[in-house]
């Protein structure tokens, strides 16, 4: 950064440096999204005793590129009676928060674009904005199917955001910070010797399960994909979209999946910390490799759920969120609060 500031001046150098860091995060993220689609098709293919994509390139590795080229070449058709400006704005409102949230995601304790103290609050605020893109997409298309899908999706996202928020309260109580780097550091000590036994997923196990399943519902993934239930409402709020406008919604969904996987890994699974004690030498050393492995395991759960569970009815989804997840999180928050101030506390106050 000092080199750029010496050439371009203080303000221009800082701006260029920030843009370079944004590009360094966004471009690999888009690549991960593309190949997550291939991984999904391969994993589900093997679970259904078939091969999956294997024609474009070796082992089908060029399939995401072929899909991107196909969508780029397709025309974006605007429905006759739609609100044209809002119709085109909706995909941007969906993908924007999904990418902007990565500004505060730490890959290691030193590798983070913006290490702000309220990073978790920033992510919660941004992810809640994604629902506006969904509602606008459903309304602007002037289709009863897209509007019904948008209403379902909005209600589902808002309902499960509450459960996710309450699950995060437990993490905030034991870590004492909204900073994601501090939350990971809090998991590096304890009676588990800094290993997998020190991470939050053990004492906060009910909150961990609620957060993971709520993340699946928040991203409208199976078995919570009633917003685009093909057998009921064609494709939900996607129904009027084509070409790159449809592809951007697709990118937003998978970018949100990766974001939920990263947050689950950071909040409950120790982030970049090794599952082995630090005394084990190189095996006990933390790093981005461990964060990537944990994210891959969480993403595999997303794909596994899609391949194995049937779709819930809409009323079942609402009942699960309001009558099961929210009471469970509230009860466990009380348990953790009492545990922290008891003689058996495993946390430093």
UniProtKB/Swiss-Prot annotation:
Q: What is its main location?
A: membrane
Q: Name one GO cellular component term.
A: plasma membrane
Localization recorded for this chain is: Cell inner membrane
Recorded hits in InterPro entries, A to Z, give: NADH_UbQ_OxRdtase_su1/FPO (IPR001694), NADH_UbQ_OxRdtase_su1_CS (IPR018086)
For membrane topology, the record states:
Multi-pass membrane protein
Annotated function: NDH-1 shuttles electrons from NADH, via FMN and iron-sulfur (Fe-S) centers, to quinones in the respiratory chain. The immediate electron acceptor for the enzyme in this species is believed to be ubiquinone. Couples the redox reaction to proton translocation (for every two electrons transferred, four hydrogen ions are translocated across the cytoplasmic membrane), and thus conserves the redox energy in a proton gradient. This subunit may bind ubiquinone.
Q: What is this protein called?
A: NADH-quinone oxidoreductase subunit H
Lineage at the top is: Bacteria, Pseudomonadati, Pseudomonadota, Betaproteobacteria, Neisseriales
């Amino acid at each position: 950064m000092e080199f750029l500031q010496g050439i371009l001046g203080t303000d221009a150098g800082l701006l260029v440096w920030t843009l370079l860091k944004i590009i360094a995060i966004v471009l690999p993220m888009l690549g991960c999204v593309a190949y997550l689609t291939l991984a999904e098709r391969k994993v589900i293919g093997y679970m259904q005793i078939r091969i999956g994509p294997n024609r474009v390139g070796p082992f089908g590795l060029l399939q995401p590129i072929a899909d991107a080229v196909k969508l780029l070449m397709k025309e974006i058709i605007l429905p006759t009676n739609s609100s044209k400006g809002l119709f085109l704005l909706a995909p941007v409102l969906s993908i924007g928060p999904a990418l902007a949230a990565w500004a505060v995601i730490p890959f290691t304790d030193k590798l983070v674009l913006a290490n702000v103290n309220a990073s978790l609050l920033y992510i919660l605020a941004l992810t809640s904005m994604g629902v506006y893109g969904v509602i606008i997409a459903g309304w602007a298309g002037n289709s009863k199917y897209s509007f019904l899908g948008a209403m379902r999706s909005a209600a589902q996202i808002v309902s499960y955001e509450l459960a996710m928020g309450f699950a995060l309260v437990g993490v905030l109580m034991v870590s004492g910070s909204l900073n994601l780097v501090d939350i990971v550091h809090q998991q590096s000590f304890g009676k588990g010797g800094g290993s997998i036994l020190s991470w939050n997923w053990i004492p906060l196990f009910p909150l961990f399960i609620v957060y993971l399943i709520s993340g699946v519902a928040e991203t409208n993934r199976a078995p919570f994909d009633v917003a685009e239930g093909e057998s009921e409402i064609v494709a939900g709020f996607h129904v009027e979209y084509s070409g790159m406008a449809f592809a951007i919604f697709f990118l937003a969904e998978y970018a949100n999946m990766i974001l939920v996987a990263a947050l689950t890994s950071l909040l409950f699974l120790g982030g970049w910390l090794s599952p082995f004690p630090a005394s084990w030498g190189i095996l006990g050393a933390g790093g981005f490799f461990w964060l990537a492995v944990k994210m891959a395991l969480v993403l595999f759960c997303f794909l596994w759920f899609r391949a194995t569970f049937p779709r819930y009815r809409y009323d079942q989804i609402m009942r699960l969120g309001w009558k099961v997840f929210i009471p469970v999180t509230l009860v466990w928050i009380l348990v953790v609060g009492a545990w922290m101030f008891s003689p058996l506390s495993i946390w430093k106050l």
